[in-house]
Regions:
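Canonical radical SAM enzyme core domain
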Residues: 1-11, 25, 64-72
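Active-site-adjacent beta->alpha loops and helix N-cap segments on the catalytic face
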Residues: 4, 29, 33-43
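Auxiliary Fe-S-binding modules of radical SAM enzymes
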Residues: 13-14, 37-57, 62-160
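Short, acidic/turn-prone active-site loops that include or flank metal/cofactor-
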Residues: 24-26, 93
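Alpha-helix N-cap/helix-start and coil->helix boundary motif
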Residues: 26-27, 134
């Protein structure tokens, strides 16, 4: 999108089941991991999509293992909730070749479980967290679960 409001509007008007835009990493590592991209612009894209279509399911993903600190990762998750991102995927960085960035840390299954619990506690409607999780991981089920939760919330509001 590179900040193009027209491009985002075209996608939103196509009424996708989910709008996915991965932030990929924490702000401190953004230039190294995503050259040419900007963390704030990625967050703004998700926020603008939400304003254009409040019912649109939004999703983002973070790959871990680039050298981020735990607190930086939690802040990135909080930043995504601040723009009302619905679904979060968290997966391990796996270096495709020696020409790519090295792996700085392998996260344990327990750490991925803790991140999932923290994300759910922050209010994400669905969190996938594990070493092999990618943004497409169980995508249809994620969309259906978020839709059910939203519909349930509307039903509860109507009963009040």
């Amino acid at each position: 999108f590179r900040g193009s409001k027209a491009a985002l509007r075209a996608v939103v008007e196509a009424e996708p089941a989910i709008l996915n835009h991965n932030v990929e990493t924490i702000p401190r590592l953004y230039r190294e991991v995503r050259p040419g991209s900007h963390y704030e612009r990625s967050l703004d894209l998700l926020a603008r999509a939400r304003r254009m279509a409040p019912e649109l399911v939004t999703k983002s993903g973070v790959i871990v293992g680039f050298g981020e600190a735990w607190q930086e990762l939690l802040q990135t998750m909080a930043d995504l909730r601040e723009v009302d991102c619905d679904i979060l995927t968290l997966g391990q960085y796996l270096r495709p070749s020696h020409a790519h960035l090295p792996i700085m840390k392998y996260y344990t299954p327990e750490e991925f479980g803790e991140l999932k619990a923290i994300g759910e506690g922050m209010g994400f409607k669905h969190v996938e967290s594990g070493p092999l999780v990618r943004s497409s991981y169980h995508a249809r089920g994620q969309a259906e679960e978020v839709s059910r939760k939203r519909e349930s919330g509307r039903t509860e509001l109507c009963r009040s």
